[in-house]
Amino acid sequence: MKSILNDFLLMIQFFTRIPINKNLQCEKANFRRGAFFLPVVASIIGGMEFLIYLGLKNFLPSNVIIVLLLLFTAMITGGLHMDGLADTCDGFFSLRDKERIIEIMKDSRIGSYGTIALIIDLLLKYQLLYSLVLKGYSIAIFLAPIIGRISILFLCLSKRTAKKNGSGNIFIGNMSKPIVFFISTIVLVLSTYFLGLRATIIPFIGALLITYLLYLLCLNKINGLTGDTLGACNELGEITFLLILLMM
């Protein structure tokens, strides 16, 4: 039980800015087991966002609430996944060789492609969430973060790391297939309860497809995955899920 609590708190500590004032075991095995709780952490984030929406919807216009939710997401996650998206775009669109791309991705300064990617990311999330709320799919506020993290888990089934050392290496190739598929089944059942089978399966398949395409792009550009590409995967998975859901 103590080990389970450690791994759960480790995921909260790693993926959010929620203060966990506790010394935790951070071995690779802890992250492997802790992956089980990544969608749980995402459900906490999505749940808080949905509660904020419910609490404000009678007082503020929906478009204003969505802006506040995007701000809240950036604060609660520290912009972790958006930073990964920006770094990935800066590197991949530089059209350099593998070593130079990785150097660019490690640079703490954001470039023009990263800036453009962040603007498009936020604009798409804003418009998609706002449109879905108007369409009666406000539950997408809760579900999208979970689907994004599921996309990360599937990407991490690959063992191809682009760097010998990197924060992403504690996840890449360190996932248990049975756990990933078990978690995905639970998420699909949950989503089906809220959205129905068709509105769950098709957007979910779309998110997995974009994850696979990103994987192929990563192999082509840097011969593997990094922590930044995992962050990019989360953002692309969320947006793809929301976009296809809106089209349903």
UniProtKB/Swiss-Prot annotation:
<dbReference type="GO" id="GO:0009236">
    <property type="term" value="P:cobalamin biosynthetic process"/>
</dbReference>
<dbReference type="Pfam" id="PF02654">
    <property type="entry name" value="CobS"/>
</dbReference>
<keyword id="KW-0460">Magnesium</keyword>
<feature type="transmembrane region" description="Helical">
    <location>
        <begin position="59"/>
        <end position="79"/>
    </location>
</feature>
<feature type="transmembrane region" description="Helical">
    <location>
        <begin position="137"/>
        <end position="157"/>
    </location>
</feature>
<feature type="transmembrane region" description="Helical">
    <location>
        <begin position="114"/>
        <end position="134"/>
    </location>
</feature>
<keyword id="KW-0472">Membrane</keyword>
<dbReference type="GO" id="GO:0008818">
    <property type="term" value="F:cobalamin 5'-phosphate synthase activity"/>
</dbReference>
<keyword id="KW-1133">Transmembrane helix</keyword>
<dbReference type="InterPro" id="IPR003805">
    <property type="entry name" value="CobS"/>
</dbReference>
<keyword id="KW-1003">Cell membrane</keyword>
<keyword id="KW-0812">Transmembrane</keyword>
<dbReference type="GO" id="GO:0005886">
    <property type="term" value="C:plasma membrane"/>
</dbReference>
<protein>
    <recommendedName>
        <fullName>Adenosylcobinamide-GDP ribazoletransferase</fullName>
        <ecNumber>2.7.8.26</ecNumber>
    </recommendedName>
</protein>
<comment type="pathway">
    <text>Cofactor biosynthesis; adenosylcobalamin biosynthesis; adenosylcobalamin from cob(II)yrinate a,c-diamide: step 7/7.</text>
</comment>
<comment type="similarity">
    <text>Belongs to the CobS family.</text>
</comment>
<feature type="transmembrane region" description="Helical">
    <location>
        <begin position="199"/>
        <end position="219"/>
    </location>
</feature>
<feature type="transmembrane region" description="Helical">
    <location>
        <begin position="170"/>
        <end position="190"/>
    </location>
</feature>
<feature type="transmembrane region" description="Helical">
    <location>
        <begin position="36"/>
        <end position="56"/>
    </location>
</feature>
<keyword id="KW-0808">Transferase</keyword>
<comment type="function">
    <text>Joins adenosylcobinamide-GDP and alpha-ribazole to generate adenosylcobalamin (Ado-cobalamin). Also synthesizes adenosylcobalamin 5'-phosphate from adenosylcobinamide-GDP and alpha-ribazole 5'-phosphate.</text>
</comment>
<keyword id="KW-0169">Cobalamin biosynthesis</keyword>
<dbReference type="GO" id="GO:0051073">
    <property type="term" value="F:adenosylcobinamide-GDP ribazoletransferase activity"/>
</dbReference>
